[in-house]
Curated annotation (Swiss-Prot):
L-citrulline binds at residues 99, 135, 139, 192, 201, 203, 280. ATP binds at residues 17-25, 43, 129, 131, 136, 194. One of its GO terms (biological process) is urea cycle. Its main location: cytoplasm. One of its GO terms (cellular component) is cytoplasm. It is found in: Cytoplasm. L-aspartate binds at residues 131, 135-136. Homotetramer. SUPFAM superfamilies: Adenine nucleotide alpha hydrolases-like (SSF52402), Argininosuccinate synthetase, C-terminal domain (SSF69864). It comes from Klebsiella pneumoniae (strain 342). PROSITE patterns: ARGININOSUCCIN_SYN_1 (PS00564), ARGININOSUCCIN_SYN_2 (PS00565). This is Argininosuccinate synthase.
Length: 447
């Protein structure tokens, strides 16, 4: 059976991921006019720029949807976001600033939950607004087929008939008006925005040019921290974790994780925390550029990693970072539920996150400027008395350290021999521009 349909399947049920915007509205109406039977499915992901979810299914019905459902995905989205924090599943960083994979997390939840809802309604053809150049077309493809093995894909934006008739936003708007809907195009921004409760992505248009900076963006989850006219007073915040799970902010507990994440967003957003500018590699290996917001994820991530470094040993932390980057890349590629990702998630959550219990106090200032003021945990392996410079009882003596250093003579001698070998083969040469001249007899050994 063909998985991807190039032309509209007339007379058949088609589920469309419906946002209520111009693109999906025009696509739904066009499919109905051409003889298909569209069903609209809208994901409530707690988008910060959406204020009336209930109105979206009603609009879909007006445009010809046979059925329209609003699927609440917030609980599942936050659960996956917390799992990503526990695993450090983030692979794109620039200058120490992290992209928290908020769009890939949203696609993992949307792609599975909407297709599951379609399957309940006997709808086995799915369409969405992703384009052939982006990541989402592959993410949705993978998650959709994982959820429903019988699924077929129809995307109006891959259908030449749709493109010929409604290839641009102006044509879509004119089509809506001609069909009796007074649908006016929204004012074009200098970039496009996609968001969910975990974060916002700003990209394309003017942001495709690297000389367009974050300063052209109007944050939807935070503030313009770069604008000196925006007053941002410093704020102390406490974050409490229990077995890797964030449970309290400023001493306040929450009825559920959704409310906790909303409060984390409010706190971090007041400062513009978690905003970053990234150049990344798309799944197809072409580079793209995005400006991201994720105030709540950033706040929780900072506190989590502070506890991590105080609780676990160096080798465990190294594995956390290495496996986390690997897992982050799988998440980005739409493989969050693949076996290799589940294996990494299980080990990181079981052996790392389970020990992360404690409270971190931070002072947030402007943007990503913050200080850690205190770290408290019964699980800390950081013990100030072990390395104190003051007199007193110690777990080891100066004589112990002399013995330990003497044992290092073995590998130091081996290293000197290797340096000499490198010099003899021409790989290394003594130079005033390096520290190598200080290695005695590097060039003169044996002369």
């Amino acid at each position: 059976m063909t998985t991807i349909l190039k032309h509209l399947p007339v007379g058949q049920r088609i589920g469309i991921a419906f946002s209520g915007g111009l693109d999906t509205s025009a696509a739904l109406l066009w499919m109905r006019k051409k003889g298909a039977v569209p069903y609209a499915y809208t994901a409530n992901l707690g988008q910060p720029d959406e204020d009336d979810y209930d109105a979206i299914p009603r609009r879909a019905k007006e445009y010809g949807a046979e059925g329209a459902r609003l699927i609440d995905c917030r609980k599942q989205l936050v659960a996956e976001g917390i799992a990503a924090i526990q695993c450090g599943a983030f692979h794109n960083t620039t200058g120490g600033l992290t992209y928290f994979n908020t769009t890939p997390l949203g696609r993992a939840v949307t792609g599975t939950m909407l297709v599951a809802a379609m399957k309940e309604d006997g709808v086995n053809i799915w369409g969405d607004g992703s384009t052939y150049k982006g990541n989402d077309i592959e993410r949705f493809y993978r998650y959709g087929l994982l959820t429903n093995a019988e699924l077929q894909i129809y995307k109006p934006w891959l259908d030449s008939d749709f493109i010929d008739e409604l290839g641009g936003r102006h044509e879509m708007s004119e089509f809506m008006i001609a069909c009796g809907f007074d649908y006016k195009m929204s004012v074009e921004k200098a970039y496009s925005t996609d968001s969910n409760m975990l974060g916002a992505t700003h990209e394309a248009k003017d942001l495709e040019f690297l000389n367009s900076s974050v300063k052209i963006v109007n944050p939807i989850m935070g503030v313009k921290f770069w604008d000196e006219n925006v007053k941002i007073p410093a704020e102390e915040v406490t974050v409490l974790f229990e077995q890797g799970h964030p449970v309290a902010l400023n001493g306040k507990t929450f009825a559920d994780d959704v409310e906790m994440m909303l409060e984390a967003n409010r706190i971090g957003g007041r400062h513009g925390l978690g905003m970053s500018d990234q150049i990344e590699n798309r799944i197809i290996e072409a580079k793209s550029r995005g400006i991201y917001e994720a105030p709540g994820m950033a706040l929780l991530h900072i506190a989590y990693e502070r506890l991590l470094t105080g609780i676990h040993n160096e080798d465990t932390i190294e594995q956390y970072h290495a496996h986390g980057r690997q897992l982050g890349r799988l998440l980005y590629q739409g493989r969050w539920f693949d076996s290799q990702a589940l294996m990494l998630r299980d080990s990181l959550q079981r052996w790392v996150a389970s020990q992360i219990t404690g409270e971190v106090t931070l002072e947030l200032r402007r943007g990503n400027d913050y200080s850690i003021l205190n770290t408290v945990s019964d699980n800390l392996t950081y013990k100030a008395e072990r390395l104190t410079m003051e007199k007193g009882d110690s777990m080891f003596t100066a004589e112990d350290r002399i013995g330990q250093l003497t044992m290092r003579n073995l590998d130091i001698t081996d290293t000197r021999e290797k340096l000499f070998g490198y010099a003899q083969s021409g790989l290394l040469s003594a130079s005033s521009a390096t520290g190598l001249p200080q290695v005695e007899n590097l060039e003169n050994k044996g002369k």
